[in-house]
């Protein structure tokens, strides 16, 4: 019925003995959590009682695994114009993850780095298992395929969530760039805006941080409100400060469910 570690929990109704047997103690994984059934016998007098018992068992499992899941999605520019800011970017991102690990509730993380092409560094990983970003991973170069990065990533996460047994309660997408779109091949502003608008209707929220561009205008073109856009200075101090802003906004948004400013 449930599997894990190449072992099974077996539920058997033996009508001739009118008893429910649970197999020897087994551990299994469900929803990222380990469960254990002990050896034992549970007497049932008829098939109706058996069904009631199974329903109760499934209800307990459902309650145990129905956690509020937060999904954090980072889409980070590593084009050539970020040269010289690698250590600040790496340090800032790692600091955000370290602090977010201390927040309550289950969290999964996706991190996509983009220039002319995209690279997925973390693919919906439980935050406790997210390793620090390294210089090898954040190696700058190339152009800025911002629209492709956002469109491809948002659509991929959307599809994954739709096929998940466990439902994500809050999805927060953080987009960081230091320049204008200049090399996307698949997505246009209209495509991205339509995609973001649909996901906002599904409860997602987006934060756009940019430098050397009209940040509010760029955000609006993609369907992200001005109130969720942040301008930062593209130097060492500015990048560090920007990641402090990201951490603060994420912590607040996780409690509220969105990046929207306080009333």
Question: Can you annotate each of these PLM segments?
Answer:
Residues 2, 8, 13, 17, ...:
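Aromatic (phenylalanine/tyrosine) cluster motif
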Residues 4, 30, 41-46, 50, ...:
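Acidic, low-complexity intrinsically disordered regions
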